[in-house]
Regions:
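N-terminal glycine-rich phosphate/pyrophosphate-binding loop and immediately adjacent elements
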Residues: 1-45, 50-54, 251
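Active-site/ligand-binding neighborhood in enzyme catalytic cores
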Residues: 40-205, 211, 219-222, 233, ...
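Feature captures the FAD/FMN-dependent oxidoreductase FAD-binding
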Residues: 1-25, 187-216
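Short catalytic/ligand-binding loop motif for oxyanion handling, primarily in non-cytosolic enzymes
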Residues: 103-106, 184, 205-206, 245-251, ...
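Mid-domain catalytic core of redox enzymes
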Residues: 201-322, 326
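Core domains of carbohydrate- and sulfate-ester-processing enzymes
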Residues: 4-28, 236, 241-245, 390-410
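A short alpha-helix-loop-beta-strand transition element characteristic
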Residues: 1-6, 75-77, 290-292, 452
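Conserved flavin/dinucleotide-binding core of flavoenzymes
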Residues: 212, 282, 291-467
């Protein structure tokens, strides 16, 4: 087993072949990001980005990896930065184990603009683990409703906030007091009979002659004996669900082609949602405390692909291990196994790999409790039907058309598209925030609200699609 100790973030991979793959990606990325850094925010930036899009939007990342490298950027072809120039053998390494950071295979058959945006705009740099709203020992700080029961506007109880992990972001936005209002969003919503509804599944959106949108939903949906069909009418409806669910779970009625053009419908129907599968299990504390041989992170070219061990604080009896992290075809091929079979097979495969390696020679199975395994299959999760909304080669402009919708057509339909489904940077929190702000700005514009700070829509950029 090759060992790569890279705690400083600048140590090269351990073999010439890996170093070559590493160098080709970093040379390409550095050339592009360095140039973008000189242009971004200037009067020339929009033209530069349009040229990049025009040059690369029809290429898959697989194509970009094999495309010959370009030694010098040419101002007469401003969108062309060449490719990575990898051989078939180097491409196979890049697909399977990346540059030591895990498989890049998830990106191979999507539009190359997605990984390019991820790289040049810094989404993949300086990543931080969100522990939550906690002290140095990992204990939650005092916060509203911590350890208390919470109920929605109709009295249904829902999960109380723990202020742990990434969910803390949602919990703080809902339960923490907004200083200007001297109350939380949760408190505000409870003042209205239908302000906050949980366990409610939207089944239809109907455009009414009055201009309002009727939202039909099943209330108390997890309790079949008490499920009740209800509806409510709104001036504006913000749509945040995964785009495939619009087609499979929600009826759209009485929206004219002017309100909802066929091109928009086609864009969200044909969006590409990546499949992904994660296999978690409980991990004995002794693995990370006493084991000095098996690495904390393993990147393999077997069906398990990537493995990560995570150390919880002492309040937890066990740590956690991600036994397998896969995307796309590598995740789909695991569908033939039950959750129990998959967890057990992952441990057996890791044991096989470790026992064959002369510098390992010991199994991982004694540390892993597969009886407490959890498998997340995003494509069969009824609330997701996919893990991240990306886009195929040639469909970047379709994705951008969904981002344009709020400004161009939402005032006619009453629908505002928000979240990962309607972005070109899926998988990160940034597009969710950006599209949320976009919806608020456009609702303010539609309702004639006064903007603060001298802001006007003239200051707000237009998303550009192919002419």
């Amino acid at each position: 087993m090759l060992i790569w100790n890279n705690s400083d973030g600048s140590t090269l991979p351990p073999t010439p072949a890996l170093q070559q793959v590493y160098a080709k990606w970093h040379k390409f990325a550095a050339r592009m990001t360095d140039h973008v850094a000189t242009m971004y925010g200037s009067e020339h930036w929009e033209a530069q980005w349009a040229a990049i899009v025009a040059h690369y939007q029809a290429l898959s990342f697989r194509d970009l990896v094999r495309l010959p490298a370009l030694e010098n950027w040419d101002a007469d072809a401003p969108g062309n930065f060449g490719g990575l120039g990898m051989s078939p053998e180097e491409s196979a390494i890049f697909y399977a184990i990346g540059i030591g950071d895990g498989s890049w295979g998830a990106f191979y058959d999507v539009c190359c603009l997605y990984p390019l945006r991820t790289a040049i705009f810094g989404f993949s740099s300086h990543l931080q683990l969100v522990h939550g709203r906690v002290d140095e020992q990992g204990n939650p700080l005092q916060a509203p409703y911590l350890g208390e029961a919470v109920h929605d506007s109709k009295g249904l109880r829902f999960a109380s906030p723990n202020y742990l992990g990434l969910a803390t972001l949602d919990e703080c936005l809902l339960f923490m007091e907004i200083s200007e209002l001297e109350k939380s969003l949760y408190t505000h919503l409870l003042q209205h009979q239908d302000g906050l509804l949980t366990d409610s599944s939207v089944c239809a959106l109907s455009k009414l002659p009055s201009g309002k949108v009727r939202v039909q939903y099943q209330w108390n949906v997890s309790n079949p004996d008490k499920t009740t069909p209800l509806s409510a009418d709104f001036d504006a409806v913000i749509v945040t669900l995964p785009s495939w669910l619009i087609e499979t779970n929600v009826r759209l009625e009485h929206f004219t082609p002017t309100m909802l053009p066929s091109s928009i419908i086609n864009a969200y129907k044909t969006a590409h949602w990546e499949t992904s599968c994660k296999v978690y299990a409980s991990l004995k504390k002794s693995f990370l405390r006493k084991n000095r041989r098996i690495p904390q992170i393993l990147v393999t070219d077997s069906f398990v692909h990537d493995v990560y061990a995570y150390q919880y604080n002492d309040n937890y009896a066990y740590d956690c291990i991600l036994l397998s992290y896969t995307w796309e075809d590598d995740a789909t091929k695991l569908a033939s196994l039950s959750d129990t079979e998959l967890a057990n097979n992952c441990v057996k495969e890791l044991d096989r790999i470790l026992l064959r390696c002369t510098n390992m020679g010991q199994p991982i199975s004694p540390y892993v409790d597969t009886d407490n395994a959890r498998v997340q299959r995003w494509v069969t999760d009824k609330n997701a039907l996919g893990c991240a909304k990306l886009y195929r080669a040639g469909t970047y402009y379709d994705a951008v058309s969904l981002m344009k919708y709020n400004r161009d057509l939402a005032e006619h339909s009453g629908l505002y598209l928000v979240g990962e489904s309607f972005s070109v940077d899926a998988g990160w929190t940034e597009p969710c925030f950006r599209t949320a702000v976009d919806a608020v700005i456009n609702i303010c514009r539609t309702t004639g609200a006064a903007f603060n700070g001298g802001f006007s829509m003239d200051d707000y950029p237009h998303y550009q699609v192919e002419v």
